[in-house]
Amino acid sequence: MANFTAADVKALREQTGAGMMDVKKALTEADGDAEKALEIIRLKGLKSLSKREGRQASAGLLAAQTDGTVGVLVEVNSETDFVAKNQKFIDFSNEVLAAAVASGAADLDALLAAPMGEGTVKDRLDAFAAVIGEKLQIGRIVRVEGENVDLYLHQTNPDLPPQVGVFVVTDAAGKSVAHDIAMHVAAYMPAYLDRDSVPADVLDKERATLEKITLEEGKPANIVPKIVEGRLNAFYKDNCLVDQAYARDPSKSVGQILKEAGATVTNFVRVHVGA
């Protein structure tokens, strides 16, 4: 007869996030001792870590915060959405974020080495992965600073934690519009801030492609440059934040909205889980 109850199974599942059968086996092996069962689950998980290294951890969530002048975001990945929406995984991700903020880490190596509990973020990540039973990883860390840093987190699926995160950095005058612009960035996915931000090689490639298309259409060679420049404007409107039609009022560009507010966007970052 088992030396544990359904309540014991439920409590250990809530503590570890492990499956019901794994918890029952551990409690049976531990003769009902919850502490021993917890250690059994942890050790079995650690032994299987190497087997999971080749798996893809492309699900997960974003945890982020801003104090108004500094924004920090971490992407924590799991193999499945089932784990991503687990409250223990969410809590763990928020602890990773707290470690990132406290340590001032600005890159992945620094974050993994940052103090967390009695060890490092890497130590806690491996231990938690052993209990959860999936490959877990820290996908990235983003740290931005500026006069005004606004944050928007978006759930692409109402059943899952945030999958898209945006930081928008503005001058002081931009506080009134920064959050709406962050929401715009989440939806419209601009690649660049403005025309000057487009790398020369990207622009050269786009111009060459447009020239080829225009010539193949049989346009007179003497007007091809003018047509190409017109088509480049369409490229800018699709890819540059300040040139895009504003989500809340498509009759105006984001640049016009900023001008009306007397504001300037100096930087933005858009992150999507797994991308």
Model regions and ranges:
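N-terminal assembly/interaction segments in proteins that build large macromolecular machines
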Residues: 2-275
